[in-house]
């Protein structure tokens, strides 16, 4: 018993000292480790007579419990002091003025996509999406693009494997193919999204944005296409009148095909869309080729339709006076702050597309 009391008194004094966490853990090991002082005392129990063993075990357990409690209290106290010390060092001065609130801006491309979607939704179009990585069939073959067409060349298209089965889509027309394969006519959709071509200069980037439109139904003709595009261009540029001309062109997936120019004039160094004696190309369009309809199991004798493709980046440049396409992708906050839009002000036809 004298050994137990001696151990107890010695370590009670030690635990009253100003210790750090490592020192307390070391004391804990000295007492209760495999070869610790208290652990060694328990090993002596087998050598004692029964009565003596009972009393010794009782006294030993009391000392063990007391020392364990003191060690736990000591550790808690040290940890609290360390936390308080850390908090004191990291405390925040709530009297300091707050940092200025910086509100982000909507990128012009995102704004124009929202504007286009809003305009076409007013005349019954729905918005469809598809993957950026496409297969060769949806991107070329189903769209009546022959094997020897220049668009299939490596210098125009980003292929992802040697077989040329997978590629980065060169337009969003594959979304039209996917939609028609998965559903039945009539179809009235637009498909905005990223597209990819191997080109880079002031007016071209390897990745750019397009919106493709498709309307398939019975008795659809070129007049419907002209009316749809006339409505869209007037709404998008927010003008009452628009001067348009359709020039004959060629696209594998439409017949007849046309490129659309709009009239404009220069006033005070700015392009004014609507009237004027100058012309500006804005999009390509045409009546959907019968072969395309056959490829998606739609009877071309029963259903007809039109399609169009518009460069979103180009429209944004024209409408908002942006001269260099590459600036769209430079991640310059100053540029975005100047050309960006209020994220709360969602474009609608009723309140105005851009304010």
From Swiss-Prot:
Gene Ontology cellular component terms for the protein in this record: cytoplasm
A GO molecular function held by the record: phenylalanine-tRNA ligase activity
CDD domains according to UniProt: PheRS_alpha_core
Family note: Belongs to the class-II aminoacyl-tRNA synthetase family. Phe-tRNA synthetase alpha subunit type 1 subfamily.
Annotated compartments: Cytoplasm
PANTHER family assigned to the protein according to its UniProt record, in alphabetical order: PHENYLALANINE--TRNA LIGASE, MITOCHONDRIAL, PHENYLALANYL-TRNA SYNTHETASE
Biological process annotations from GO: phenylalanyl-tRNA aminoacylation
Pfam families: Phe_tRNA-synt_N (PF02912), tRNA-synt_2d (PF01409)
Claim: Ribosomal protein is one of the keywords in the record: no
InterPro entries xref list: aa-tRNA-synth_II, aa-tRNA-synth_II/BPL/LPL, Phe-tRNA-synth_IIc_asu, Phe-tRNA_ligase_II_N, Phe_tRNA_ligase_alpha1_bac, Phenylalanyl-tRNA_Synthase, tRNA-bd_arm
Protein name according to UniProt: Phenylalanine--tRNA ligase alpha subunit
Cofactor stoichiometry and binding remark: Binds 2 magnesium ions per tetramer.
Enzyme Commission number, as recorded: 6.1.1.20
Subunit text: Tetramer of two alpha and two beta subunits.
Catalytic activity: tRNA(Phe) + L-phenylalanine + ATP = L-phenylalanyl-tRNA(Phe) + AMP + diphosphate + H(+)
Annotated residues for binding of Mg(2+): 255
């Amino acid at each position: 018993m004298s050994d137990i009391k001696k151990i107890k008194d010695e370590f009670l004094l030690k635990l009253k000292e100003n210790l750090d966490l490592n020192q307390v853990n070391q004391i804990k090991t000295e007492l209760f480790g495999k070869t610790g002082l208290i652990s060694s005392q328990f090993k002596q129990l087998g050598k004692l007579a029964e009565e003596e063993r009972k009393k010794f075990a009782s006294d030993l357990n009391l000392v063990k419990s007391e020392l364990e409690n003191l060690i736990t209290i000591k550790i808690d106290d040290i940890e609290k002091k360390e936390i308080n010390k850390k908090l004191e060092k990291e405390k925040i001065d709530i009297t300091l003025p707050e940092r200025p609130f910086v509100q982000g801006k909507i990128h012009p491309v995102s704004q124009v996509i929202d504007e286009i979607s809003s305009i076409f939704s007013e005349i019954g179009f729905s918005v469809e999406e598809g993957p950026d990585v496409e297969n060769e069939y949806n991107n070329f073959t189903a769209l009546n693009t022959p094997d020897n067409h220049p668009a299939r060349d490596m210098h125009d298209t980003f292929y992802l494997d040697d077989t040329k089965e997978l590629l980065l889509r060169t337009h969003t027309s594959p979304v039209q193919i996917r939609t028609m394969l998965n559903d039945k006519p009539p179809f009235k959709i637009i498909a905005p999204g990223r597209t990819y071509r191997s080109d880079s200069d002031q007016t071209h980037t390897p990745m750019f944005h397009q919106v493709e439109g498709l309307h398939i139904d019975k008795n659809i003709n070129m007049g419907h296409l002209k009316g749809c595009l006339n409505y869209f261009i007037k709404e998008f540029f927010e003008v009452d009148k628009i001067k348009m001309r359709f020039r004959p062109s060629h696209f594998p997936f439409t017949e007849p095909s046309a490129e659309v120019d709009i009239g404009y004039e220069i006033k005070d160094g700015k392009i004014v869309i609507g009237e004027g004696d100058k012309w500006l190309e804005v999009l390509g369009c045409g009546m959907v080729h019968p072969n395309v309809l056959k490829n998606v199991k739609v009877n071309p004798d029963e259903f007809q339709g039109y399609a169009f493709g518009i460069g979103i980046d180009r429209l944004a440049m024209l409408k908002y006076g942006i001269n260099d396409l590459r600036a769209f992708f430079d991640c310059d906050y100053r540029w975005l702050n100047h050309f960006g839009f209020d994220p709360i002000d969602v474009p609608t036809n009723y309140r105005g597309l851009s304010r």
